[in-house]
Amino acid sequence: MDLEAFGANPNGVLVPISGTDPRTGTQFRHKAFLPHPLPREVPELSAETWAPVSQASVALGRLDQAGHQVPNPGLLRRPSIRREAVSTSALEGSFAPFQDVLEADVAEEESEASPAVREVLNYVEVAELALDRIGLRPISVGMLSELHAILVRGTPGDSQDAGRVREIQVVIGPEGSRVEDARYVPPPPGDQLVSGLSDWESWIQNEGIDPVVAVGLAHYQFEALHPFDDGNGRLGRLVVVLQLIRRGALHEGLLTISTWLEQRRKEYQDHLLRVSQTGDFDPWVRFMAQALRAGAEAAIDRIARLLELQDMHRETIRTYPLRGVAAQIAEDLIGRPVVTPTAAARIYDVSYQAANSAIARLLEAGLLDEVTGRRYGRVFVSGDVLNAIQG
């Protein structure tokens, strides 16, 4: 890490570290960056930043209103979570095609999923659990530790530290690089890290700062502390949505920001690093406000496209006509665009034969296509819904 680049930051200090790098077995003696606790009042921000902050607030309000107008927002939450899961994992270098994720989501055997898809599905499980709980529990290190254990389960990041604040030194940089050559070295494990997390946990409950600004500050601090040995980026971006819900800016987990960030990965990483080097929050808050606005507007458009498709599906239900479980599956396609007879039987509590017959009716009605070409283990997809989700 370029120590000179961090020397002038008034919002943190360099602390000495030494030990054995667990990745290489080599000894190191260097310094890590320890951020000071976040300010209790809004840091000085320029008019150039307050404008996108205001625009983000308006966009989030429109998204929240759109969520309120949907009879079953939980159905729309499903594709939002899975879209976010694919992009947030891609930001960490784990790439899985969206359709592969949805197919694995309904697969009978977990072992059928590739390692990349498994990581994405772990995130889906984590996000659904967190969104179900956030109305009842505040954001805390304990909650995130529970989520972390699920996030890394069965992946290369699964270790004895899964579900616990890390007890090893980690670095951010090219794989295999020396500690001294890392792009960023987070605080060492121990009392300083634990204290920093405690301050962060207390700060995030503070409602005296504009929610958009607060999201930016909290996300930076979480990434700078890097409390876990893996999965910090994915958890940190999930906290963005949880934080907005706790603050009342949103009521449903319909926001996705990682698709926008994925397209600006280097800029995202550079902004985070620059705050640690300079202590200047202004460009970072502006960047995050732009991400929130873009994510909210994309979600609003996605909801509109899906509801339009649902209206078309309802027309097919009426005119074909479709009844019973076939009508239920058709009604839910905007949230479950990939189905199998086994999954449908489980979801709608009917026999395999009834589910299979219902899917055959949807195939005849043109609402589904079979994508495997197999006689057994067939998978059925609504291509229109997939396209609408991916935009």
Regions found by a protein language model. Name each.
Residues 1-391:
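FIC/Doc superfamily catalytic core
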